[in-house]
UniProtKB/Swiss-Prot annotation:
Keywords: DNA integration, DNA recombination, DNA-binding, Endonuclease, ERV, Hydrolase, Metal-binding, Multifunctional enzyme, Nuclease, Nucleotidyltransferase, RNA-directed DNA polymerase, Transferase, Transposable element, Zinc, Zinc-finger. The gene is ERVK-11. The lineage of its organism: Eukaryota, Metazoa, Chordata, Craniata, Vertebrata. Residues 57-245 form the Reverse transcriptase domain. Early post-infection, the reverse transcriptase converts the viral RNA genome into double-stranded viral DNA. The RNase H domain of the reverse transcriptase performs two functions. It degrades the RNA template and specifically removes the RNA primer from the RNA/DNA hybrid. Following nuclear import, the integrase catalyzes the insertion of the linear, double-stranded viral DNA into the host cell chromosome. Endogenous Pol proteins may have kept, lost or modified their original function during evolution. This is Endogenous retrovirus group K member 11 Pol protein. It catalyses: DNA(n) + a 2'-deoxyribonucleoside 5'-triphosphate = DNA(n+1) + diphosphate; Endonucleolytic cleavage to 5'-phosphomonoester.
Length: 969
């Protein structure tokens, strides 16, 4: 045919010759030669290596070489006594661009139509029949050394795919796939599976299979490939990809698990990996392997010791029994597939069937991501996972899905469960709850905890109401028909509250409504009845959650639990009852408050005398009007608190820069006083990465007094708290899911990313090739070069010297008290972009105010005269000529001696914004509509705006005292 003619050429003698296959070139990260020295070899191995090299040379697989590349070569002896040559290509693989897998997973033999005859072949030395591209051969050179260097070493290079090369499997798959493509096109009604160098052919009849195989032989030979004649299988049982295939059944090949080699985490990890690979055939539910999975917990070091427990030994025995007896079925290509979901213990189990024939099992992982995973959510996840598996196997959705739910429960799941909606998205088949009658599923251990039976989502009528509370001092309590205080060993308010809820569920054997001020405990109690509880390294937490689940499931009466916000001062019986529960656990706090009101003892003394936390003790002192201190500012609504000096307060966050690849996690820290930024790019955002970043910050910025972060796991872990404690650093977090509390660092993230984009798209910094180099250049620009609005120095200068050079520091200011809706006078401590920190007065805490709630203070004329006589200001006599006023100049103008027109700008049509007298709002003075024209006597002139020389003529008339603040509107 035409395709055959294209592949053949006619020589000058007239004989047909096979055109050599076209090699697939490799892509290299560098052309710089990689040379790894050959290590010495014992004489016996050296002789074997010479023999093997000569054999490969005769076959044309290698050739002599003078390449600047070199990889070590060695030999190993097989059980048969024969030697095998191997090349250590790790260094070369590191500079090869990976091609990626073409078959990410094994094909399932269950998709082979039942009763179809098979032929299975194995390609002989497949890698050695596929040529390397000519330009790539020199990269795979090796050296055979000489003993005592008594003669020159012999050097060769591979001409075919070497064993151990990174892309050899992918090139092999591509090469063999090209050879089989004409076979697939001509025999499209045959079922052909190809994996690496193993090929399976199935056809409806033997004659068609023989025709297909004959054509396949020719195509394989034309491609330069050879079939291993001793590995052709034509009769049952067939062995393919670890499975034993019969006419209708498929069984795993018989193996025995060696238990004496199971010593370390790595040993068990490999064992469970192998078992998981054949579990879809064995049908071992997740609950039946829980003890084996539990061995993987603990130390993550691969060489850490592990012990095979008696329970895990029984589970291994079960696996061995299943290997001996388990089987699945080949499919009927004309019949649809169905998915059955069984409510088994621990997690649901899925089974793909055709009629009543088992095709494959499906399971969920033993470990979950969430602390509580509802059983209904697990069913939905398993449905979505298995639907994708069925589509991958046969290209179609299952015809029917059978679930352990009633029609009404399915309807409610579509309404209320997001996981259910995702798992069944775009499914157009049948959802049923009638299982086929067969004995193959009877061994499964079922659970009845699919949907909640005891927990209610709405308040119960005619039921008792109980309020719970817990304290970090270890006390738990509840109030209601009766009161009870429980002493717990926990130093966590949430855990104490959890004990309170468990106690209520145990003490009240009747319908109850529970009200708690812990949202975390409420959500956990709502979900725990049907949830799979994720294992935690915290044994106390595991015990509490398991006890809570057992308590809920043992109840005979329903309950409802809801959340109430604590300390809201709202009217009503719910708030009052919750406060009563609070009082039961906070008696020590009340006594501490009483002692401080009497003696004003400091926070350390309160913590030493009473069972209160540091935060509670500090709050008592800070809320005392006699004990307030200047360096503990309160937070005004709408403003992020800043530090009042370098390293007083940092904000820290993790942002993502996708262009950095593996190092896309960029940890960012900003000093809220100086706005000095430091960032490091890392491979993750766990606690270890955060600590690594902070140590880098300490080396550059110093050690802070306080750090504020979000509520990410890396910042809330015990390891991170211990790290901060060692460095004597205070730590606070913002409100969960509310980024406004981290506004400074969030804005810094945006600034840093913008700078990176500027450098990448418009910079001339080709030497910055790595992510950290790009980051360092951006940080240098932002810290040492940029000067921001309202500042006269860089962030680095401010951070190192502690000087901000703000023109308004120390000046009087009007600030708006949003709580009382009044304007008060204060003194500016620091002034930044869009914010200021103001001291309201002596013995009062500073407040952070948005600049939109600030106005410049205008002192009475008497105070102005006194200040003019004591401060370095320039006295000026009244005159008709303009007075030159510079930025930040202060000029006291004496009163006039005659009557003139009201004050106005010399420039036509301009206006002056003037504050009159004391505690009055600013008014507009000038010719424009709406401006007043008051008479004036004296005023102090200041020009706070950045502008060139301002020339004004001031006309003096008798009247009230005022001071103008010049602002062009």
């Amino acid at each position: 045919n035409k395709s055959r003619k294209r592949r053949n050429r006619v020589s000058f003698l007239g004989a047909a010759t096979v055109e050599p296959p076209k090699p697939i070139p490799l892509t290299w990260k560098t052309e710089k030669p990689v040379w790894v020295n050959q290590w010495p070899l014992p004489k016996q191995k050296l002789e074997a290596l010479h023999l093997l090299a000569n054999e490969q040379l005769e076959k044309g697989h290698i050739e002599p070489s003078f390449s600047p590349w070199n990889s070590p070569v060695f030999v190993i002896q097989k059980k048969s006594g024969k030697w095998r040559m191997l090349t250590d290509l790790r260094a070369v693989n590191a500079v090869i661009q990976p091609m990626g897998p073409l078959q990410p997973g094994l094909p399932s033999p269950a998709m082979i139509p039942k009763d179809w005859p098979l032929i299975i072949i194995d390609l002989k030395d497949c890698f050695f029949t596929i040529p390397l591209a000519e330009q790539d051969c020199e990269k795979f050179a090796f050296t055979i050394p000489a003993i005592n260097n008594k003669e020159p070493a012999t050097r060769f290079q591979w001409k075919v795919l070497p064993q151990g090369m990174l892309n050899s499997p992918t090139i092999c798959q591509t090469f063999v796939g090209r050879a089989l493509q004409p076979v697939r096109e001509k025999f499209s009604d045959c079922y052909i599976i190809h994996y690496i160098d193993d090929i399976l052919c199935a056809a409806e009849t033997k004659d068609k299979l023989i025709d297909c195989y004959t054509f396949l032989q020719a195509e394989v030979a034309n491609a330069g490939l050879a079939i291993a004649s001793d590995k052709i299988q034509t009769s049952t049982p067939f062995h393919y990809l670890g499975m034993q295939i019969e006419n209708r059944k498929i069984k795993p090949q018989k193996i025995e698990i060696r238990k004496d080699t199971l010593k370390t985490l790595n040993d068990f990890q490999k064992l469970l990996g192998d078992i998981n690979w054949i579990r879809p055939t064995l049908g071992i539910p997740t609950y039946a392997m829980s003890n084996l999975f539990s061995i993987l917990r603990g130390d993550s070091d691969l060489n850490s010791k592990r012990i095979l427990t008696p329970e895990a030994t029984k589970e291994i025995k079960l696996v061995e029994e299943k290997i001996q007896s388990a089987q699945i079925n080949r499919i009927d290509p004309l019949a649809p597939l169905q998915l059955l979901i069984f409510a088994t213990a621990h997690s649901p189990t899925g089974i793909i069937i055709q009629n009543t024939d088992l095709v494959e099992w499906s399971f969920l992982p033993h470990s979950t991501v969430k602390t509580f995973t509802l059983y209904l959510d697990q069913i939905a996840t398993l449905i979505g996972q298995t639907r994708l598996r069925i589509i991958k196997l046969c290209g179609n959705d299952p015809d029917k899905i059978v679930v352990p739910l009633t029609k009404e429960q399915v309807r409610q799941a579509f309404i209320n469960s997001g996981a259910w909606q995702i798992g069944l998205a775009n499914f157009v088949g049948i959802i049923d709850n009638h299982y086929p009658k067969t004995k193959i599923f009877q061994f499964l251990k079922m659970t009845t905890w699919i949907l909640p039976k005891i927990t209610r989502r709405e308040p119960l009528e005619n039921a008792l109401t109980v309020f719970t509370d817990g304290s970090s001092n270890g006390k738990a309590a509840y109030t209601g028909p009766k009161e009870r205080v429980i002493k717990t060993p926990y130093q966590s308010a949430q855990r104490a509250e959890l004990v309170a809820v468990i106690t209520v569920l145990q003490d009240f054997d009747q319908p109850i409504n529970i009200i708690s001020d812990s949202a975390y405990v409420v959500q956990a109690t709502r979900d725990v009845e049907t949830a799979l509880i994720k294992y935690s390294m915290d044994d106390q937490l595991n015990q509490l959650f398991n006890l809570l689940q057992q308590t809920v499931r043992k109840r005979n009466f329903p309950f409802y639990i809801t959340h109430i916000r604590a300390h809201t001062n709202l009217p009503g019986p719910l708030t009052k009852a919750n406060e009563e529960a609070d009082l039961l656990v906070s008696s020590a706090l009340i006594k501490a408050q009483e002692l401080h009101a009497l003696t004003h003892v400091n926070a350390a003394g309160l913590k030493n005398k009473f069972d209160v936390t540091w935060k509670q003790a500090k709050d008592i002192v800070q809320h005392c009007t006699q004990c307030q201190v200047l360096h503990l500012p309160t937070q005004e609504a709408g403003v992020n608190p800043r530090g009042l000096c370098p390293n007083a307060l940092w904000q820290m966050d993790v942002t993502h820069v996708p262009s950095f690849g593996r190092l896309s996690y960029v940890h960012v820290t900003v000093d809220t006083y100086s706005h000095f930024i430091w960032a490091t790019c890392q491979t993750g955002e766990s606690t270890s990465h955060v600590k690594k970043h902070l140590l880098s910050c300490f080396a550059v910025m110093g050690v802070p007094e306080k750090i504020k972060t979000d509520n990410g796991p890396g910042y809330c872990s015990k390891a991170f708290q211990k790290f901060l404690s060692q460095w004597k650093i205070s730590h606070t977090t913002g409100i969960p899911y509310n980024s406004q509390g981290q506004a400074i660092v969030e804005r810094t993230n945006r600034t840093l990313k913008t700078q990176l984009v500027k450098q990448k798209e418009g910079g001339d910094s080709k030497e910055c090739t790595t992510p950290q180099m790009q980051l360092n250049l951006a940080l240098y620009t932002l810290n040492f070069l940029n000067i921001y609005r309202n500042q006269t120095t860089t962030s680095a200068e401010q951070h190192l010297t502690g000087k901000k050079n703000s023109p308004h520091e120390g000046k009087l200011i009007w600030w708006k008290d949003n709580k009382n809706k009044t304007w008060e006078i204060g003194k500016v401590i620091t002034w930044g972009r869009g914010f200021a920190c103001v001291s309201p007065g002596e013995n009062q805490l500073p407040v952070w105010i948005p600049t939109r709630h600030l106005k410049f203070y205008n002192e009475p004329i008497g105070d102005a005269k006194k200040r003019a006589s004591t401060e370095m200001v320039t006295p000026v006599t009244w005159m008709d000529n303009p007075i030159e006023v510079y930025v930040n100049d202060s000029v006291w103008v004496p009163g006039p001696t005659d009557d003139r027109c009201p004050a106005k700008p010399e420039e036509e049509g301009m206006m002056i914004n003037i504050s009159i007298g004391y505690r009055y709002p600013p008014i507009c003075l000038g010719r424009a509509p709406g401006c007043l024209m008051p008479t004036v006597q004296n005023w102090l002139v200041e020009v706070p705006i950045v502008s060139p020389i301002c020339r004004f003529t001031y006309h003096m008339v008798s009247g009230m005292s005022l001071r103008p603040r010049v602002n062009y509107l």
